[in-house]
């Protein structure tokens, strides 16, 4: 269970938020879904879940050497992180039916502008910053919805439902393949890699190691 942890629970919540477009909102069927920070703990599991749901997953990463890793998780397409840098128009061509954003920051400006009518952007991270410079056009012209994901505030009923769905949507052998078991000493050695963005996947601390 700790292989999934809060990251896995958050990824499940994000994926169900994206799915809400066709279920709760009775919108068009979801097809193309963008996942930012795709090599991270939440992103990796989200790629896997969304692919299992039958969506075409477009994974965003700054790590060119992880393309095969993301394809193995189910990503159909890999997009470089730089594609979401720089200035954005008020509205751009609608590309994404749904988005799982684990990064936050300036990239969201372009993501909002590229989301299709009725699309849902599930936001759960702030590694890229806490400020968003955007405009109201995606929201009032296309009905784009920003869906904040607060995993810690989920009710017991919601937790029971989400964890009950995990076995159907997550390949635990794949999660195990990108999960590292660390001792306390190894954890201290790993922190610099985390800060530099050189660590990917999941880490579990084993106090007996």
Q: What is each PLM-predicted segment?
A:
Residues 37-38, 103:
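NAD(P)H cofactor-binding loop motif with strongest signal on the N-terminal glycine-rich segment
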Residues 106-172, 207-208:
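Glycine-rich phosphate-binding loop and adjacent beta-alpha segment
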Residues 51-106:
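Adenosine-nucleotide cofactor-binding segment
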Residues 39, 43-47:
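N-terminal Rossmann NAD(P)H-binding glycine-rich loop of SDR-like oxidoreductase domains
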Residues 1-33:
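NAD(P)H dinucleotide-binding glycine-rich loop of Rossmann-like/cofactor-binding domains
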Residues 32, 56-57, 120, 145:
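Residues at the starts of beta-strands that form the adenosine-phosphate
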Residues 157-209:
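C-terminal hydrophobic helical "lid"/dimerization subdomain
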Residues 10, 41-42, 106-107:
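Hydrophobic/small residue at the entry helix of a nucleotide-binding pocket
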């Amino acid at each position: 269970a700790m292989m999934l942890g809060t990251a896995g629970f958050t990824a499940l919540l994000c994926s169900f938020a994206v799915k809400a477009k066709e279920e709760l909102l009775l919108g068009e069927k979801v097809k193309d879904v963008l996942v930012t920070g795709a090599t991270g703990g939440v992103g990796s599991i989200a790629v896997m879940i969304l692919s299992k749901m039958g969506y075409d997953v477009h994974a965003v990463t700054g790590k060119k050497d992880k393309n095969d890793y993301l394809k193995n998780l189910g990503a159909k397409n890999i997009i470089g992180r730089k594609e979401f840098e720089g200035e954005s128009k008020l509205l751009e061509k609608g590309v994404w039916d749904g988005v799982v954003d684990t990064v936050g920051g300036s990239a969201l400006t372009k993501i909002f502008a590229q989301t299709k009518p009725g699309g849902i952007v599930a936001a759960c991270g702030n590694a890229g910053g806490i400020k968003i410079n955007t405009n109201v056009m995606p929201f009032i012209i296309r009905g784009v919805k920003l869906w904040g994901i607060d995993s810690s505030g989920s009710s017991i009923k919601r937790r029971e439902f989400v964890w009950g769905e995990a076995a159907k949507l997550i390949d635990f052998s794949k999660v195990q393949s990108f999960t590292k078991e660390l001792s306390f000493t190894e954890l201290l050695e790993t922190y610099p890699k985390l800060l530099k963005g050189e660590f990917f996947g999941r880490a579990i601390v084993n106090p007996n190691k």
